[in-house]
Curated annotation (Swiss-Prot):
UniProt name for this protein: Small ribosomal subunit protein uS12cz/uS12cy
Source species taxonomy: Eukaryota, Viridiplantae, Streptophyta, Embryophyta, Tracheophyta
Signal sequence residues: none
Gene Ontology cellular component annotations, sorted alphabetically: chloroplast; small ribosomal subunit
CDD domains assigned: Ribosomal_S12
Length: 123
């Protein structure tokens, strides 16, 4: 417990909240342009070729975003919407691309969990 004199000398510092998605600048989503679309391998013990895109956001940040779902139509200069949310087995990937908006089309032939992949209700 500090003395009153110590508290006068230097006041208590408030605890700063550290955001997990700083590139969004407090917004729920951000628009951006793909600069590179490629695959990377996850860390142990998983094995796959995960699809990711390097995206330049309107906030000025250059980030790596995961492309969820099976198959995609993204290429360089595609305009995408990015949300927060990391991919646990891909180090440095802290954002997801929102499917079914802007240039990212929804996942083809998706029946369950459609809202997460931008798919309309089948007739």
């Amino acid at each position: 417990m500090p003395t009153i004199k110590q508290l006068i000398r230097n006041t208590r510092q408030p605890i700063k909240n550290v955001t997990k998605s700083p590139a969004l600048r407090g917004c729920p989503q951000r628009k951006g342009t793909c600069t590179r679309v490629y695959t990377i391998t996850p860390k142990k013990p998983n094995s796959a070729l995960r699809k990711v895109a390097r995206v330049r956001l309107t906030s000025g940040f250059e980030i790596t975003a995961y492309i969820p779902g099976i198959g995609h139509n993204l290429q360089e200069h595609s305009v995408v919407l990015v949300r927060g949310g990391r991919v646990k087995d891909l180090p440095g990937v802290r954002y997801h691309i929102v499917r079914g908006t802007l240039d990212a089309v929804g996942v083809k032939d998706r029946q369950q969990g459609r809202s997460k992949y931008g798919v309309k209700k089948p007739k």
